Amino acid sequence: MGQTLTTPLSLTLTHFSDVRARAHNLSVGVRKGRWQTFCSSEWPTLHVGWPRDGTFDLSVILQVKTKVMDPGPHGHPDQVAYIITWEDLVRNPPPWVKPFLHTPSTSKSTLLALEVPKNRTLDPPKPVLPDESQQDLLFQDPLPHPPHNPLLEPPPYNSPSPPVLSPVSPTTPSAPTPSSLVSSSTPPSSPAPPELTPRTPPQTPRLRLRRAEGQDGPSTWQSSLFPLRTVNRTIQYWPFSASDLYNWKTHNPSFSQDPQALTSLIESILLTHQPTWDDCQQLLQVLLTTEERQRVLLEARKNVPGPGGLPTQLPNEIDEGFPLTRPDWDYETAPGRESLRIYRQALLAGLKGAGKRPTNLAKVRTITQGKDESPAAFMERLLEGFRMYTPFDPEAPEHKATVAMSFIDQAALDIKGKLQRLDGIQTHGLQELVREAEKVYNKRETPEEREARLIKEQEEREDRRDRKRDKHLTKILAAVVTEKRAGKSGETRRRPKVDKDQCAYCKERGHWIKDCPKRPRDQKKPAPVLTLGEDSE
């Protein structure tokens, strides 16, 4: 049995229900047709190393994301939802993606601030003059100082008192080293550091250590490494610029003309820019008319989720989830950000609901495949038409048969003939129909082949016309020659002229043809003579 090659694109298409659920968690929506089109046709043309079968390489995904989210005219706002969903599949891989991911070669570390232990006992100050037991230390040679290494210097701390030296045991014959310096700063809330087991100090110390005398045992090395602590993140805010609003309004159709395109644009803006409540109002004010804005707000208030996740009908919950006046949400807190997320989600649902037009199947039937349009692009336009002019989802299983019949009937003639000859059309899925149509589309002649064929057909038509004209001229010439020949033969068959006294029969002179003795004569019967008393019959 043969083996099937699994690619990132085919893997995501097989588990597309999980992909759609992942996108829903990111507050965006993705469609299977566009997912396949962007991966196999659009992103390879960005020249960042994206293969036609997709990839799980995070560096390539981030390069595509940079190109797609370009704020200039070369950006692709309609593709943002798809590339960030792809990125999330790699950053938080589901079980069916993990076997295909590359293991990172290096690990990243986070540098955090050190915290001084809280319960720190201050060492007593060292005596100014040594006692009698330590006088012998004055006559010994001092130990050499270690080489200065700036990497081993501790970070600066704001300590209320200068550092002090730890006491040295009288029995220790060595002088204190620079590593025995201890900071005396004591922050109010920090646990005491654990003590290390007795051991010899390392050759190259990386931690701040000090030597302390135990009560009943030898000296121990205690660590002064402070516990790590995290720092609160601060949310940065960038309002919309006037140029952004102008470009969005100028380079995109109006909501009444193409609601799907403008909805995709606003969806990408909500995802990438993370706008506040005021920014959302500014966006609606610029991109929508008054009537369109009222319809969007009305539909959005119908889709405010309740405690169970379903749309609620309670006015107080609707006003709380989708307020019409400026709320007092604190975006630095988790509840404030959650309220803003629910507001954006309801606003996006309102845009999609207001973009649906009255049911008009006649509009759907007018969507036909173009002369040079690919089957995948035609299928995408057809699905958009169903979403725009019908109330049902064309990708739902119960409506796929209707979409399939429309795709076959409204396709190009050569593709339509091929699809109509398939066995069991009702059992074929939409993707299977597109693949069969692609086979016919890819076998079409190129423009060069078409031009050569037209030239050849023109030459053949001219040859047939010349042959027909030559044949007609041949018939005319043949008729003329035949007539001339007939005229000449008629002249030769005329009787020769005779003189006035010459017989035309025997050519002798002295009599005419009627009196020619050599001419045979017919025996005439004598006319009957009637007698008296007989009647003629």
From Swiss-Prot:
InterPro entries in UniProt: G_retro_matrix, G_retro_matrix_sf, Gag_P30, Retrov_capsid_N, Retroviral_Gag-Pol_poly, Retrovr_matrix, Znf_CCHC, Znf_CCHC_sf
Bias-annotated ranges (Pro residues): 143-165, 188-204
Keyword Transport: no
Matching SUPFAM superfamilies: Retroviral matrix proteins, Retrovirus capsid protein, N-terminal core domain, Retrovirus zinc finger-like domains
UniProt site (Cleavage): H145, P146, F226, P227, L477, A478
Low complexity bias (residue ranges): 166-187
Residue ranges of the motif PPXY motif: 154-157
Gene Ontology cellular component annotations, sorted alphabetically: host cell late endosome membrane; host cell plasma membrane; host multivesicular body; membrane; viral nucleocapsid
Motif stretch (PTAP/PSAP motif): 173-176
Lipidated residues (N-myristoyl glycine): G2
Post-translational modification (record): RNA-binding phosphoprotein p12 is phosphorylated on serine residues.
GO biological process: viral budding via host ESCRT complex
Phosphoprotein keyword on record: yes
Any matching Pfam family: Gag_p30
GO molecular-function terms, A-Z: RNA binding; structural constituent of virion; zinc ion binding
Zinc finger (CCHC-type) residue numbers: 501-518
Residue ranges of the region described as Disordered: 137-221, 302-322, 443-471, 514-537
Alphabetical UniProt keywords: Capsid protein, Host cell membrane, Host cytoplasm, Host endosome, Host membrane, Host-virus interaction, Lipoprotein, Membrane, Metal-binding, Myristate, Phosphoprotein, RNA-binding, Viral budding, Viral budding via the host ESCRT complexes, Viral matrix protein, Viral nucleoprotein, Viral release from host cell, Virion, Zinc, Zinc-finger
Compositionally biased residues, Basic and acidic residues: 443-465, 514-525
Protein name (Swiss-Prot/TrEMBL): Gag polyprotein
Primary gene name: gag
